Amino acid sequence: MARQALDLFDEGFQELTPSEFFRKNKQMLGFTGKIRSLTIVFHELITNSFDAAEEAGILPEIKIDLKRIGKDHYILRHQDNGPGIPEKYIPKVFCTMFAGSKFRNIQSRGQQGLGCSGCVLLSQMTTGKPVKVISGTMENGELKGVKMTLKMDVKKNQGLILEKEEVEVDGTGVCIELHFKDVSYSLSEQGAYEYIRRTMIANPHARIVFNDPTGNRYVFNRASDVIPPMPKEVLPHPWGVTADDLIFMAKHTDKRRFGSMLKSNLSRMSSMKIKELEELTGIDLNKRPKDMKWEEAEQIVEAFKKMKFMSPPTSGLIPIGEEQIDKGMKEILQPEFTATVTRKPKTYRGGIAFIVEAGIAYGGNSGRLVGDQRKAEIMRFANRVPLTFDAGSCAITEGVKSLDWKRYGIRDLENAPISIFVNVVSTNVPYLSTGKQSVSPEPEILGEIRQATMIVARKLHKYLRKKKAAKEEAQRAKIFESYVPVIIKQAALLAEREEPDYRELLDTVTRRAKLEILGGITE
């Protein structure tokens, strides 16, 4: 006898909390391999520490200890000097999925609200161990410290406090201790060390001390004392909204008229634009927002595309800046030559603002070390965050490799000792997947990546030409210095005269070459 639908649903229908969902789909958090999983953990903890410190006006300082206690089994201790986390928020920060301060339309290193809680979930899934947190905060001018031991209640998507006590702390900040299995530490291009190295190039205002499992201690010193200004929250641009966006705004606004709602919820909207919109659509924008129909919202979106607006405001975009990129590259790579550029803001998909920055470093420790040879490396970033995976599908890789590098004095890009830096800045970086490791090849973004890379490549080409000319001139100078004394001596003998004082003249002829050998390339 066939079973009834109600019986089937009563037995099998379930609801999943976000924690339960990601427990079954941890690959959606980026945890898809031993090396990658550990690198993602480093990424989440470091970016959270940076964001917290910068928002509080503090130069970030982080200490990381990674100890191996078994095969693919590690203890990670991460400590920062940020403002700390108030006691009542600690369980939410570390044990609740989709809880955080990164859900605004603002440029941010993280956007999903999964960072710390995702790391705790991975730790709990692979070891069953709780997370230990020490937080120091300033409350009413008094330094307070609290220590908690927590586990995540996956069913309820919330934290369970196993232990809690007040402790003395040296200053504000957070220290977190996590156990992980099925992860691996590697010095490869995708490993945790390389992630830190690249992070420091894009964040020269930070300092990180890293003690790795092999006993090595790496100190990445601060190259700048300038804290990046905080980006401002920006309103969506009319060219970038959808019918669903408008209906959502209408349901949650406190405005009494749809036109007023548009002016307060969208950038570049004025009374003149509202009047123009009414004329184009024939829709009465004085109606209540909740009375707006889907078909009318679609009409408005189509009308927006026909209207002229100023470009989106760029106050919400904070690039690293040419000087700071240069400082970062020089501190970490110690190159022979650097060039940087920050392009002017552009838009993609009609109304989403973005900025592309590029840098190039040649010689020194530039490039990736393969055996005893240095080869080219493309350092990809989005909002200062290194993208260490999925390079093949990324717009940055495509844009850089699409150049004819022979035109810029690089005959074999793969084997050149150069590091190419590209950072995409936006409130809404178009990632190709939830792993957020590659930028979508939007035509406008791809074009800007090419333009920025060409600018720094031309500067490198100019330097390489000067270097080649200097080398040739130095060789000519050596010939002069070797043969002029002999020629003058023989000429004096033939003429039966004393040798003239030729040294001042010889110095004048060879001075430029000597300067270039001793002091570098000069104009």
From Swiss-Prot:
Q: Cite the InterPro entries for this sequence.
A: HATPase_C_sf, Ribosomal_Su5_D2-typ_SF, Ribosomal_uS13-like_H2TH, Ribsml_uS5_D2-typ_fold_subgr, TopoVI_B, TopoVI_B_transducer
The UniProt keywords, alphabetically, are: ATP-binding, DNA-binding, Isomerase, Nucleotide-binding, Topoisomerase
Keyword DNA-binding found: yes
Superkingdom, natural source: Archaea
Its recorded reaction(s) are: ATP-dependent breakage, passage and rejoining of double-stranded DNA
Q: What class of enzyme is it?
A: isomerase
- Could you say which residues bind ATP here? N48, D80, S101, K102, G110, Q111, Q112, G113, L114, G115, C116, S117, K436
Q: Which Pfam families match?
A: HATPase_c, Topo-VIb_trans
Q: Which CDD domains match?
A: HATPase_TopVIB-like, TopoIIB_Trans
Provide the E.C. number(s) assigned to this enzyme: 5.6.2.2
Q: Name one GO biological process term.
A: DNA topological change
Give a yes or no for keyword DNA-binding in this entry.
yes
State the NCBIfam families in the record. Answer: PRK04184.1, top6b
The free-text function statement in the UniProt record for this protein reads: Relaxes both positive and negative superturns and exhibits a strong decatenase activity.
The record's comment on protein family reads: Belongs to the TOP6B family.
How does this protein assemble?
Answer: Homodimer. Heterotetramer of two Top6A and two Top6B chains.
What protein name applies here? Type 2 DNA topoisomerase 6 subunit B
Gene designation per UniProt: top6B
